[in-house]
Amino acid sequence: MNPLTKVKLINELNEREVQLGVAEKVSWHSEYKDSAWIFLGGLPYELTEGDIICVFSQYGEIVNINLVRDKKTGKSKGFCFLCYEDQRSTVLAVDNFNGIKIKGRTIRVDHVANYRAPQESEDVDDVTRELQEKGCGAKTPPSSPPEVSEDEDAKVTKKPKKDKKEKKKKKEKEKTERPVQAELPSCSRSKTVKETDEQSAKKHSSKPSERAQKSECRERKKSHSGSPDGRTSCRGRAEEPEWEAKKEKHKHEHKPSSRREGEEKSRDKDRGRSSGTHSSRHHGHSEGRSHRSRSRSRSRSPDRSHRHKKHRYSHERESFHASDRRHY
């Protein structure tokens, strides 16, 4: 069969599998799963082993190569065999490199089921023998883990023990810190409870004192209902703090009223003296004048304080009694 027809057939198989979505297990590549060798045909004669490795190493690490040459001349015959490190790289190489052109020539890439190494001959060089025996791949380290000495094993085993001890210590510290934190809010709560109890006790103690003051005021009001002294004394005891605060406010307001009261008192004194010298007929007129002066003083100073009213009331009584005595 012509090599170009083989290239076309391989490409058609790959296209059908892609269209149908065939799994890897059922694919035609699975027939060569035990072989990591591929065949390369139609290569240019100028290519060397290094050139071939550069092109085909795109899809995997190349382990071995066998470029077939003429025994007499040593020239390439245009085909070779490649071995990949991973068998799956052969599938990628066949699918992607089959049918490509290198230096104007289409190459063919296909799987190799059973590769046989060439027979040894006397004309073969030492370099080719080493390649055939050892291959051209780089030496990779073994996949198994390196052996560890007994001392290193002991160190590795000691570390987790220390970690466990540290974890236990941390847990113990956390346990000791938690009850301390729980005690702190309890102390603060007890303080707040004590403060509330003290406030409530003060309130209860102030209430009976206020009630006692109110009851005393009521009794004094009943006994001294006619006298203004009783009212003032009761109010003074119950409203001492309020009265002291109002005193300072009304000082400036009562300055002009105090002057007027002084003038009126002097007038009342003069009138009382004159009433003693006159006869009994003029006694009624003096009383009328005194009543008028009272009404005038009340209308002029409506904002007088309780003390001034009390003083005025006592002074008028004295003047009235003095006039009566002189008359008799």
Curated annotation (Swiss-Prot):
There is a cross-link at K8, K246 (Glycyl lysine isopeptide (Lys-Gly) (interchain with G-Cter in SUMO2)). The modification Phosphothreonine is found at T140. Residues 36-114 form the RRM domain. The keyword Kinase does not apply. The keyword Nucleus applies. It is found in: Nucleus. Keywords: Isopeptide bond, mRNA processing, mRNA splicing, Nucleus, Phosphoprotein, RNA-binding, Spliceosome, Ubl conjugation. Pfam families: RRM_1. It comes from the Eukaryota. InterPro entries: Nucleotide-bd_a/b_plait_sf, RBD_domain_sf, RNA_proc/Spliceosome_comp, RRM_dom, RRM_Ist3-like. Residues 157-172, 291-314 have a biased composition (Basic residues). Residues 192-219, 236-247, 255-273, 315-328 have a biased composition (Basic and acidic residues). Involved in pre-mRNA splicing as component of the activated spliceosome. As a component of the minor spliceosome, involved in the splicing of U12-type introns in pre-mRNAs. This is RNA-binding motif protein, X-linked 2.
